[in-house]
Amino acid sequence: MIPEIIASLEYGVAVLGIKVLLVLGHSNCGAVKAAMNAGTVPGQISALYQYLQPAVAKSDGNIDKATEVNARFQAELLRASSTVIRDAAKAHQLKVTAGVYDLATRKVRLSELPYLE
C-alpha cells in the first residue's frame, strides 16, 4: 500500500479514534476478473494486478474466493505495514476486518481476522 493511504488510515486511528477499519471488496469485481485473466486494460489499471496476485493464486479460479482472499490479505497487510494500526489492534482499541459486499443482495459478508497478541 502506498504511504498516503496508510497515513490517512493512521490519522483516523490515532487522531480521530476510529474503532474499526473494514477492507471491503465487492462481488463481480472487474479488477479481480482482469487480474485473473491477465487481461489488457487501458492506462495504468494493470498496476493493480501485482496487489491482486496473492489472492488470485489462492482462488482456484473462483472470482468470489479471490475477492474475499484479497480483502483479507489487504487487511492483514494494513496491520503489518503500520505500527499505529498494529499497536491499536494489539491493544484491542481497533478492529481490523475484511468483508465482501454482494451487489445483488446488497449485503456484506464479513471475514474475521484473528486478534493480534
Language-model regions, residue ranges each:
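Divalent-metal-activated hydrolytic enzyme cores
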Residues: 1-19, 30-117
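Conserved functional hotspot residues or short segments at active or partner-binding sites
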Residues: 23
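Active-site cofactor/cluster-binding pocket
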Residues: 26-27
